[in-house]
């Protein structure tokens, strides 16, 4: 697991209070992890703070799974 993936997983576990074994790449924040719309906004803000990046609204709308977040953040931090 990449450093980005580990950091994303830690943030998701802390913000949503879910078991680590549920936080897998294809886990949907809302459908699988029980997040609501406010939770997803807070997750995006936490990702921005942790990785020192800005996630535009149009990109944030496409981040619906743990894997989506990891992929976006790996690209954003590699630039």
From Swiss-Prot:
One of its GO terms (cellular component) is cytosol. The keyword Kinase does not apply. It holds the Pfam family PP-binding. GO terms for biological process: lipid A biosynthetic process. Pathway: Lipid metabolism; fatty acid biosynthesis. Its main location: cytoplasm. Carrier of the growing fatty acid chain in fatty acid biosynthesis. Belongs to the acyl carrier protein (ACP) family. This is Acyl carrier protein. It comes from Methylocella silvestris (strain DSM 15510 / CIP 108128 / LMG 27833 / NCIMB 13906 / BL2). The lineage of its organism: Bacteria, Pseudomonadati, Pseudomonadota, Alphaproteobacteria, Hyphomicrobiales.
